[in-house]
């Protein structure tokens, strides 16, 4: 089993291959809903390495692995010597002798690439600072469930255009031929290297990078994410002031001409005061809602949580693709 069976970033795949992942995920969702067992990998063992905290990714990989019949071991940042007392390369070689697959969620893209290179087993990128590829299969699965197609659709991402989700949305939309708009202040627009990758792998559609929120007018899908990424050290007040004009609220939705526009969020979302961080932000800065208002979140919660559920089915598809010939 080689690095080729790993799932590291979206640009490693063609339009057809990404569509195949999505179609397979939809089949797994049907099996789950109908309670049809699909323990295709009984007796295999996978490791889940988490340097960053997680709700959806950890839960999805755990349940997906168990549904597929595998034994799942969680390895948190305080559980193993990853890069501390043992090099990442040595860790990869050790884990590769014991596990049939490895999920990694952490900071550097280089880390997940090294795991894939030296472990000798499939490695799945659960999130790095650069890419979030498993999220994309779930996101565009949700888009296909809603619209039944990708052709002639336009997706607009509003917020921090330099984060991993924005990067992944930009390149995946380009690969699938979806018109994609990254709407963000100039200070937070995608790196030129990421835009170049999107253009290199573009199959159809248009790529737009702008700071003008009027660009939402002809969109079919609006997407946002938290304004400060995990581990990022920034002036929070400065970031809020910069991104508040890009909040998805009813006033912004009123500017969208498509009546059935889809609103997505990869979660977690700061839309109310029901979190410790949300209350802290309110006490310090006076804002009850950040990237999306609570009214919009509640109105579109069904599809947002559908998107979250689809992490499970899409991760099954990704792991099945890697392990089916083991």
Curated annotation (Swiss-Prot):
Show the InterPro entries listed in the entry: Asp/Orn_carbamoyltranf_P-bd, Asp/Orn_carbamoylTrfase, Asp/Orn_carbamoylTrfase_sf, Asp_carbamoyltransf_Asp/Orn-bd, Orn/put_carbamltrans, OTCase_ArgI
Give me the residues that bind carbamoyl phosphate, please: 54-57, 81, 105, 132-135, 266-267, 311
- Per UniProt, where does L-ornithine bind? 164, 225, 229-230
- One Gene Ontology term, aspect cellular component: cytoplasm
- What's one Pfam family the UniProt record gives for this protein? OTCace
Any one Gene Ontology biological process term?
A: arginine biosynthetic process via ornithine
Has keyword Transmembrane? no
What subcellular locations does the record give? Cytoplasm
Q: Quick one: which pathway?
A: Amino-acid biosynthesis; L-arginine biosynthesis; L-arginine from L-ornithine and carbamoyl phosphate: step 1/3
Task: Identify the PROSITE patterns for this entry.
Answer: CARBAMOYLTRANSFERASE
Which top-level group of life is the source organism from? Bacteria
Transcription as UniProt keyword: no
Reaction(s) catalysed by this chain, per the record, are: carbamoyl phosphate + L-ornithine = L-citrulline + phosphate + H(+)
Enzyme Commission number: 2.1.3.3
Family membership noted in the UniProt record: Belongs to the aspartate/ornithine carbamoyltransferase superfamily. OTCase family.
Q: What does this protein do?
A: Reversibly catalyzes the transfer of the carbamoyl group from carbamoyl phosphate (CP) to the N(epsilon) atom of ornithine (ORN) to produce L-citrulline.
Q: What is this protein called?
A: Ornithine carbamoyltransferase
- Give the source species: Streptococcus mutans serotype c (strain ATCC 700610 / UA159)
Which gene name does the record give? argF
